Amino acid sequence: MALLWLLSVFLLVPGTQGAKDGDMRLVNGASASEGRVEIFYRGRWGTVCDNLWNLLDAHVVCRALGYENATQALSRAAFGPGKGPIMLDEVECTGNESSLANCSSLGWMVSHCGHEKDAGVVCSNDSRGIHILDLSGELPDALGQIFDSQQDCDLFIQVTGQGHGDLSLCAHTLILRTNPEAQALWQVVGSSVIMRVDAECMPVVRDFLRYFYSRRIEVSMSSVKCLHKLASAYGATELQGYCGRLFVTLLPQDPTFHTPLELYEYAQATGDSVLEDLCVQFLAWNFEPLTQAEAWLSVPNALIQALLPKSELAVSSELDLLKAVDQWSTATGASHGDVERLVEQIRFPMMLPQELFELQFNLSLYQGHQALFQRKTMEALEFHTVPLKVLAKYRSLNLTEDVYKPRLYTSSTWSSLLMAGAWSTQSYKYRQFYTYNYGSQSRYSSYQNFQTPQHPSFLFKDKLISWSATYLPTIQSCWNYGFSCTSDELPVLGLTTSSYSDPTIGYENKALILCGGYSVVDVTTFIGSKAPIPGTQETNSSKTPSLFPCASGAFSSFRVVIRPFYLTNSTDTE
């Protein structure tokens, strides 16, 4: 009776003011029954793209607003272009949904069009004669309060933390039965259930159970792994999927790298190959700061073995990579076999002869693996001192192998930093979190002239090639620097050279996309003289978004990396 009384009291509570996610409205029409379609999400209104827009989609809008049906589904900003984000694109409804938010689409704020394609509708003037008082917005909080009260329960839950203390809670089967995600609990036989939970996840169990009532939960960087684990174990598929998508968002938000490392171990333990690949990719792009962090010495051997073969591994130089491996293996007491496998992945030809010579004096690993180092050094010295034509004639070296190609070397020898705009104090502080530096060129410029060697071989040490790198945010800036751009590709990065290039050398140049001045969230390739800049949620462009979202909403800077390699099919080698 107390439960029914509480629910009846809830129905008398006035609704809160303001729109809710999924609410819709019509704007800029000649009457209330027509206009540009706008939908509310995360505190603001935005428009809907007309891709795939049809009468079924329009019916959903009109019926939700109290009209009988839609008479027209209009496209091409028939009621004028809107402002703000484009909330939905490629919407496909059956016509029976309560909101466009419940229809199939590309997802919130993922769009391939601009406001010139805003969707509109014309609804029938006759309303259904129905007036709706909707207080349902208060229901999640009211149900959550029922769980918080821990009274009048008919299901008792004993949560055991595997020797780290138990937790006694209770629930209401009547409410749980309304939520398909709670089946694992309400289908139990009897009035009690035991939940066995990892000790580290005990603090989030109460929030997890409350979610079955309110269908709302706050997920943080510290709780996402446990909530994903609980959702997976108890069949809460919506929560499981939500947490899975959040992993990609949370990876760049921890400058200590504890979260990416924990998620990597979790992915391995659960067999989640997608999450594992994401963790490896993020750590490869941010390898340099990882080696400077306290967490470096706790990186598992399997992860380092997965990182070292990658060409898209961002580090100041190959020598610094080897020194980091030396530090890690010494501190962790890695086995002889593990060290040998790691050293085999080092690209010795990417180190200069002087650096190779000094390894025997400066590297702890050298004496224990002397034969391996000597063999690798001799192979590298051949690469540095023998011209390509002679190597091709007398050696069966496969110069297309990764060992003869550079990684993403971020030192000033091979790269230059471009700013997207004014350098903020906050970004500078973030970059000083670690002692490494991304270069000493003018940090405040969106245009850089710099020089690099033509090739990593010592034969080209004094043969420099000049580059000009530019951040191009507008058509006018493209014209100013001699680039041909379209509005769809802006902003874009430009890279040109005014120097003669050896016909036996090719370039696969890259751009590191930085968020907050310190975290690499994507890497793009220069095709010709331009490299695309990914889209962000804030810009809401038709561009593919960065692999890892930028929490600040805009990219702070870009590191242009020059990557030369031998063209083994060049006629000059014959």
Curated annotation (Swiss-Prot):
A Pfam family it matches: BACK
Q: Which residues form each disulfide bond in the chain?
A: C49-C113, C62-C123, C93-C103
Please describe the organ and tissue distribution of this protein's expression.
Detected in thyroid (at protein level).
Which terms in the GO cellular component ontology are assigned? extracellular space; membrane
Q: Please state where this protein is localized.
A: Secreted; Secreted, Extracellular space, Extracellular matrix
Predominant place of localization:
secreted
Specify the glycosylation sites in chain numbering: N69, N96, N102, N125, N362, N398, N540, N569
Keywords assigned by UniProt, alphabetized: Cell adhesion, Disulfide bond, Extracellular matrix, Glycoprotein, Secreted, Signal
Q: Which GO terms describe its biological process?
A: cell adhesion
Q: Residues of the signal sequence?
A: 1-18
Q: Tell me which residues make up the BTB domain.
A: 153-221
Query: According to the entry, what is the taxonomic lineage of the organism?
Result: Eukaryota, Metazoa, Chordata, Craniata, Vertebrata
**Protein known as:** Galectin-3-binding protein
What does the UniProt function comment say about this protein?
Answer: Promotes integrin-mediated cell adhesion. May stimulate host defense against viruses and tumor cells.
Q: Where is the BACK domain?
A: 260-360
Q: Which domain of life is it from?
A: Eukaryota
Gene that specifies this protein: Lgals3bp
Assembly and binders? Homodimers and homomultimers. The multimers form ring-like structures with a diameter of 30-40 nm. Binds LGALS1 and LGALS3. Binds ITGB1, COL4A1, COL5A1, COL6A1, FN1 and NID. The unglycosylated form interacts with PDE4DIP; this interaction, which is PDE4DIP isoform-specific, may connect a pericentrosomal complex to the gamma-tubulin ring complex (gamma-TuRC) to promote microtubule assembly and acetylation.
Under PANTHER family, the record lists: GALECTIN-3-BINDING PROTEIN, HL07962P-RELATED
Expression is induced as follows: Up-regulated by virus infection, double-stranded DNA, IFNG and insulin. Down-regulated by hydrocortisone.
Q: Where is the SRCR domain?
A: 24-124
